[in-house]
């Protein structure tokens, strides 16, 4: 993308954020749908770091005695609920978490996984044999899409989630969430094996009694813990 195209993209997104904020101010209504842009505002982490204040985001890492890294590069207000899931799993496994902390338009902080090159994430990925990444996508149906390069384990995980009462499916490498790109941060580990878990907005909302930035931390419910326990059981049984 040229510099002129990048500037135009940023201007468009800023205008959108202004209009969305005006809508909220005038009506008190905040749309629950997630707006997706065909192009991220920032082409990589260095680009984001150059243009965003440090208090707009947070990076949380924890190294555990485990060959599994839980990766959540779109946490906080970017893909709500993935931060809380990652932090819960950090009690047992290594974790890298990038969180959007802006008051609005956290989607501007979304850097697609193929371009996500935050130094600590790259370093942690290289030290672990396997990566399980957590993402969110917009869907009114409670559902889980499971991709990644570790296709056999992805199928097993989908089967386990379905047995535990969730709706889940393993997706092909050609799916838009397939996660097979060589430069995908989740694939930059020792083995190149990854599982990419995409959780619908409806399912993430169901995991909390109050699905807000401030409310999620203290309103985790049975669905939340059923998900994390299912994933932990899967890791114990398959790695």
State where each predicted segment sits.
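Bacterial N-terminal signal peptides
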Residues: 17-29
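Function-determining sites in protein domains
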Residues: 14
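N-terminal catalytic or cofactor-binding beta/alpha core of small enzyme domains
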Residues: 32-239
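N-terminal secretory signal peptides that target proteins for export/translocation
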Residues: 1-11
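Intrinsically disordered, low-complexity segments enriched in glycine/proline and serine/threonine
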Residues: 7-8, 17, 132, 201
